[in-house]
Amino acid sequence: TDAVADGVHAISGVVDT
């Protein structure tokens, strides 16, 4: 996975976009 996508996922937390 892309680092950016991973970062966003971490920030999103429970919310998976």
From Swiss-Prot:
It is found in: Secreted. The keyword Secreted applies. It comes from the Eukaryota. Expressed in skin glands. Keywords: Secreted. Its main location: secreted. One of its GO terms (cellular component) is extracellular region. Belongs to the Frog skin active peptide (FSAP) family. Septenin subfamily. May act as an antimicrobial peptide. This is Septenin 1f. It comes from Osteopilus septentrionalis.
